[in-house]
Every structure is written in C-alpha cells, then in structure tokens.
Amino acid sequence: MTQISERLLVQAHLDAKQPNPLTAEQEAEYRAAIAAELKAQNAVLVAHYYCDPVIQALAEETGGCVSDSLEMARFGKNHPAETVIVAGVRFMGETAKILTPEKRVLMPTLEATCSLDLGCPVEEFSAFCDQHPERTVVVYANTSAAVKARADWVVTSSCALEIVESLMDNGETIIWGPDQHLGRYIQKQTGADMLLWDGACIVHEEFKSRQLADMKALYPDAAILVHPESPEAVIELADAVGSTSQLIKAAQTLPNKTFIVATDRGIFYKMQQLCPDKEFVEAPTAGNGAACRSCAHCPWMAMNTLERVLDCLRNGTNEIFVDPALVPKAIKPLNRMLDFTQAARLKLSGNA
C-alpha cells in the first residue's frame, strides 16, 4: 500500500466505532425516523454493498438502491428525488454531485474516504500523466473529482475490462490509476499496453493466497470468489473474479453450496439475501497471528451509521460540493463510462 499513513488508518477505525451499540428498539426508532425524513424531504438513500447490513436494508425498505458504484451513480442520476443521500465513501458522493449538479447530495459523514483516493493525489498523478502525453488516461471510480477531471475515461470494476479492451482495439495505450492490482489483472486479461499507478485498497490487499489455499483445503467443495482489487496470487486461486455485482451473480449461478469470499464482508448481506440456502465464508486477511488493518471490512464504509444518516437529513449537514471548474472536465469521462455501459446493455439485450 502506498502514500497513506498508519495514523489515518487507525483514526478511521476509531471513528467508525460506536461507543454504545444500538439496542433493537433504538435501531427501529432510527429507521422509522429516517424513513419519515426521506419521505418529507423528497430524498432517496443509495448505499454501497460494503455498507453495514442495517444501512443496506434501510435503503431497500425506503425505495432506494443498494448496488455497486456504477449503479449507484446511474440510480442517483435517474431518480426524481430532489436530495440524494449517499451511504458510501467520499468519491461516491462527489460522483453523484457531478452527474446531477442540480440535486442536493448529502452524506452521513464527509470523513469516509478511500485508500485508493488517498493514494492518488491529483498533483502527483497529473505529473505522471504529463510524462506520457500520448497515452489515454483511464482512472478507477475510486478517485477524487480532481483526478477524474484529469482523465479521459472513468471506469468501475464492473466495466473496466470491456472499456480497456475497446481502447486497445482502437490502438490506444493506457495510463491506469490508481489500483495496481485491478490494473494488473486487466493488463493480464487483455494484453493491453498499460502503465500502472502504485495504489491499493486496504481491504483487498490484506487477503493472503497461502491462507486462502489452506481455507480451500478445509472447504474442498467451496467456490472461491475474488474481487480483482486483490493481489495477483489471490486472484489466481479464484473460481470467479469480478466486481461486487458480478460476484453476487456468481454466487447465484454457480452450483456450489459454499463460497469463500475475498472482498469486503458487507457484501454478505446481499449474498445471503439472494442465496439463503448457501454458506458464505470470509477469506482470510492475515496469517499466523498477524494483525489485520481492515479485517475484511472497510473502516470508512463502517462510518455510515443510522445516527449519522438521520443527522445529515435533519440538519442538512455534510453536503457535497464540487469545484465548478472541475465539473465540466470530470463529467466527460463519467458520461463516457455511462454511455459505454448503456450501449453494452442494449447490445446484450438485443442478442438475448
């Protein structure tokens, strides 16, 4: 992992913890209050698969959305609500605001960031790009608005492979940032000429191939599901590699009854909901007594609590603003991604 201090990681863990866990009665009260506020304010709650289960359930119950970052962006853009509450990390709120500048975008906390975002400062990344002006700049969605504004394309893990293949077919060479593991996976799958930025996700980088192989021995009939932000040695052990939505689909379609899952454990809520007859096991994140920093759950995603959702709704706090000078530049690569994926959907449905 690069360019991120241990202090930031420790502080994120501390901030994510609630000193007094909610009782069932308190939780029900918060959920009812949030639902009422959403309705009164013509607001909608969108949540990422990595948020805690109670937040995901609330989004579904109130007519919102639980999805990966691509569908979160699409849902917020197309929904008629005047206010969008984004339960996720900072770049997701920024993306929602860029795509729908006329809407009010709130987040439970503005402190929920991402190690990939932190590890890709715009000044350093821009200098890297300037050294290779002939290359097309492709950035992962897990980046700041400023980095997106420097890019030619924005991608998510659910569409990155197809977009890079398309660019390669056009004869383009690529600068990729910031996740080195996802970039290396795409490079290996496509053969594309890619220069990789040296960033990583603190959750996925902690999965260990040796311990994963040991776990497979304990569950010989299990299928291994791996997010491509994981190290290459972990990916090589996978039965299915993909984005959050793609891993959920794999859990539904593969015949196995047991799955070892190498991604944030927040995804278990949706997997268990859709596959109640199947067993899901967390892939190991540290071996032989070593301490894990994320322990298979993003500390920043864990900051999205019921208390903070209600507070931002009632008080209008943690509103997302994006520098107006960045918006025209950042929206171009985002719309390229949305247009590309929409065209791919239409093509797929036409071939069905």
From Swiss-Prot:
E.C. number: 2.5.1.72
Cofactor remark from the record: Binds 1 [4Fe-4S] cluster per subunit.
Record's keyword terms, sorted: 4Fe-4S, Cytoplasm, Iron, Iron-sulfur, Metal-binding, Pyridine nucleotide biosynthesis, Transferase
Record's subcellular location: Cytoplasm
GO molecular function: 4 iron, 4 sulfur cluster binding; metal ion binding; quinolinate synthetase A activity
Cofactor (UniProt): [4Fe-4S] cluster
Binding sites annotated in the UniProt record for [4Fe-4S] cluster: 114, 201, 298
GO CC, one annotated term: cytosol
Pathway assigned to this chain's UniProt record: Cofactor biosynthesis; NAD(+) biosynthesis; quinolinate from iminoaspartate: step 1/1
Gene3D superfamilies hit by this protein: NadA-like
Xref: SUPFAM superfamilies: NadA-like (SSF142754)
Catalytic activity reported: iminosuccinate + dihydroxyacetone phosphate = quinolinate + phosphate + 2 H2O + H(+)
Record: residues binding iminosuccinate: 48, 69, 140-142, 157, 227-229, 244
GO BP annotations, alphabetical order: 'de novo' NAD biosynthetic process from L-aspartate
A family per Pfam: NadA
Family that this chain belongs to: Belongs to the quinolinate synthase family. Type 1 subfamily.
Function noted in UniProt: Catalyzes the condensation of iminoaspartate with dihydroxyacetone phosphate to form quinolinate.
HAMAP family reported for this sequence: NadA_type1
Name of this protein: Quinolinate synthase
Organism: Pseudomonas putida (strain ATCC 700007 / DSM 6899 / JCM 31910 / BCRC 17059 / LMG 24140 / F1)
Gene name of the record: nadA
